[in-house]
Amino acid sequence: MQFTALAEQPVVAVGFGLTVLLFVGDLAALGYWARKEAAARDRSVVRTLWYLLTGVGAVHYAFVRFIRRDPGSRDAPPGPRERLAAAYTVAVVLAFLAGAVVSPPDPVTQVLAFPPLFAVAFAAMALLVTREPLAEESNAPT
């Protein structure tokens, strides 16, 4: 598909633009998340960034840190911005994987499906990383 065809099909152009913006935002959120995590653990930002750049590393870390609530060796608990940056990064990975499974193998369709899939994944991840852990909920008196 040529770039001149994007001007003829505004829906594809908007979908392509949103997808590019989401991926650029993911890089910014990933950098912020890596910097905050490395500072809280007194570790190298580069090593943390490389770990989080792998999709498996980001999903694993978000699960351990925010869903299981494993405190690890941090100086302070993660703040709300760090939690949302993690949710954004993991939502991009999940939306990409869901798009590969759900949408047809046509690249244009996958680009058009990415923004709505991201919105759903981000909402789900934001709810997961901002809620209280399940262990505390089960200890609450009834």
Walk through the language-model features, giving the residues of each.
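Hydrophobic alpha-helical membrane-associated segments
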Residues: 22-30, 124
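Hydrophobic alpha-helical transmembrane segments of multi-pass membrane proteins
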Residues: 14-25, 115
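Haloarchaeal acidic low-complexity proteome signature biased toward cell-envelope/secretome components but also
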Residues: 1-15, 39-42, 70-83, 127-142
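Alpha-helical transmembrane segments and their membrane-interface exit regions
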Residues: 117-126
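Alpha-helical transmembrane segments of polytopic integral membrane proteins
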Residues: 27-35, 60, 94
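Membrane-helix boundary connector in multi-pass membrane proteins
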Residues: 97-111
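Hydrophobic, aromatic-rich membrane-embedded alpha-helical segments
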Residues: 47-70, 107-110
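Alpha-helical membrane-anchoring segments
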Residues: 43-57, 84-97
